[in-house]
Every structure is written in C-alpha cells, then in structure tokens.
C-alpha cells in the first residue's frame, strides 16, 4: 500500500516544484505590428489616464478633446480617468501590468516608461506608427489636421526615445523657473542680474534671513515668518546643480555617479545656508507659492507649469485673499553657476500607448493619442499654465502668437507671470537637457532629491553634518532606493530575476521527465485495473 501512495505523492511534489519554477517569468503580449487598415466596422472602447493640476480648465479641455475626437470617430469611445499625481498613475500602471489591464493611453514620464518596459511588449514602440503613410504623424487617412513628424519640436521628441525606440510622444513641455519677489530684493539693496546665479541667490537669501528688527520680525517683510529661498522639486535642484558643474549623475547605461565630491560639496553648502535660515524645501515647509504670495519668500523655484499659482495677482491660490502682499514678480531661469552657458531641465508630460492583444485596439488608441497633438488641444492646454506646445505647428500658429502677445492683458488667460514662464522656455529650448532613461532612473531621481531633503532636515534639527554624516547618508540613500541593484525592479514591482541559472534549467529538464513518468504510471494503473476487471 505504501508503494502505491509514495509514487503519486512524489510525482505530485515534483509537479509542484515545476509550477513554482514556472513563476520565474510571466507571459507577455505579442509584439505590435501596424494593421494594413483601421477596421471602422468595429466598436472600440479605450481608456485614457491623465493628470490635471487641480485645474478645472484642464479637465474641461480633456473632455472637449474626447467629445471632438468621438465625433470624428464614432466607433471609438474614450473613457477618462483623472489623477492629481503622476506617482499614482505610475503605481496603478505597475499594478495593472501584472493583470494585463493597463490603460490604452496614459500621461506619464519617460523614467516611468523605462520601468514599464521590463514587462514583455507592455508598451507600444511608436516608430512604425510615426512613419505609417495612412495613420502616422500627419497621415493621409487621419480625420483631423495633425502634425507631421517634421513639425514636432525635435528636442522634445528626442526625450521620448530610449531603449532603441520612441516609446512616447511629448504632450506638453515645461521647465523650472525662479519666481522672484523683485520688490523685496531691491529693498535689501540688490539689483537683479540678467541671469540668476547661485552666488547671488544665496547672498541675498542669507542677508534677508539675517536682517531683523528689534521686535524680532524680519526687516524685509515686517513679519515673523520668512523663508527666503524655497525649492519645490529638490531632485531637479540637485540634478541641475550637478549638470551645471559638469559633475557625474549617471551614465546612459545606468551607472550611478551621483555620490561624488561635487555632490558632497554642494550638500555642505546647502547645509550652511539652511543653518542661517536662508533655505527650505516644499516637503519640509510647504508650497513655495504660498510663502511667495504672502511676502514670506524672495526666491521660489517651481515648474513653469505652476505659474498660475505664483505672484501677488495669481489667479490660483491656496491662501486667502487677505494674506496676499503686493509686489513685483520677476520670472527668471533657475540659478546658474555659469550664467554665460545656462543649463536647465526639460520636463513635462508625455503620452504612452500600451500594447494589447488586438492591434486594431492599439491603432484606435494611437489615433486618439495623436489627436491630442492637434493645434486645438495643444494651444488650449498650454494656456492653462506656463506650458509650451510640443509642435512647431502650434507654436507658430497665429492663435498661439496672439496669445503670447497679450501678456498681462488680464490676470486670468493672459496672466503675465504665466506667459513670461512660457516665454522663458521658448527662449531657452536649446539650453535644456534631460537625464538618462533606464529601468531604475526614477529611483535615482528620487535619491537626488532625498540627499538635499535629508541634509536640510538634519540641519534644522541641529544635527551635525560632517564627513561621518555624509558617509551614512550615502549608504542610507543607496539602500533606500536600491541604487546598488541596477535594473533590479521589474514592471510588476518584483525582482527582475534574469535568465534561469544552469541548475534551475537542469531541474526543469528533469521535471519534464516527470510528466512522462506520470503518464506511464497512469497507463500502467489503467491496464492493471482493466486486467483485474477482465479476470472477474
């Protein structure tokens, strides 16, 4: 009896091992190929995940774009899902990759797409679609007037090319700007230079923090609160500082270079200015615009895509009207180490098209994504903030040029700070740069900001920032963001295991034979059973 039980049990155990080994990888989609034609006899429902900056006008533009597109393509229905944070879109996409329930189109960033690409054929490479005569950029079969590939701003399109293909198209572009309370800077006896430098910003910020009245209030604003220099995205702060210094950040292949002597020197400098009360960050103190508009900040660095929140006449605000202080707002490039050769980051949302089992569904999604590049959508959306359109077709249009020309005509559509922010990027496209994109680049970006955040917090807590502190900081940030495990994260959030090792392959071969043994065993048992039945 024991012999009869042992063999099936052994085979079952070995089969379980085979199942576990099968978990090493997951089934991917088939590679996408462009259909010969779009099947208009079918109905399609596609999902579009988008971000809005808590801006109702942006939501209205999305909805109008969807309505107008559906009028052109009645057989394509678009469902919109809105987010207020790019990180949440990223996390939800990662979650849905494992169940093949990704959206058809989503607004995202190249760093995020690089992680999506660790899943097999998850994201649609767009080069063949770009070039398709009928449905590509400016294609002959399109029912709208979309841009040709030559009409895309080349620097913006290039940002969407990595891992050998274009995996996105740019939707909007922005950069960072320094929004300056010019009135307070001049009250301290300084004159703004043509190009901001780090030395100037630190000097003025230190002076503002040090100048107090006998009653303890700050001399420049007469208030008890003053944070002279506030930076919203400290990851960009560190990245731009390193770029301007010509120091290492990372290579295109993903080699981490950020832990260098220049980084350490920059962190010591930030610590020194923080100790004097000159510097803080969004994560530590709050939204820079709130302090700027209340007369509690002189230099507020934020995206040009946040320009409608900046200045004493800002149309959008998180503070009450009675907290506003009247001052002149200057919109300037981020501080530079070499003002003769300014360098600033290029950023902004891009459109990613996800692969599906049905290539017709992918084509329907591409038709919608491409519609978002039309002048109507590009110009309308760019006017909601200090964005710029990503096509020369839109930038050079009479409608957009008229919009720029009306800078300051009102404090809503033509709000001067917003249009100045857009012009800042338009004038500096050739001075922008992007960071390398690869699986893990998003983690390195977060780590860059974490270095500044941790140093700033430590100084405010009166902790010593010295060589021992720096060594510990580097170790903790490396561990937190797994920077010593390049490419270690797969699209589903698990470890990317890579090829099976030789012993595992041998085990799989052995287990393959188990199936044969099970079949033989089952056959033998069946023959024995029939023999016993015949003998009776």
Which residues does each predicted region cover?
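Extracytoplasmic/periplasmic substrate-recognition and gating elements
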Residues: 273-278, 315-394
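Extracytoplasmic/periplasmic solute-binding protein
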Residues: 158-171, 176, 200-256
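Long, aromatic- and glycine/proline-rich binding clefts that accommodate carbohydrate-like moieties
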Residues: 329-336, 383-450, 454-456
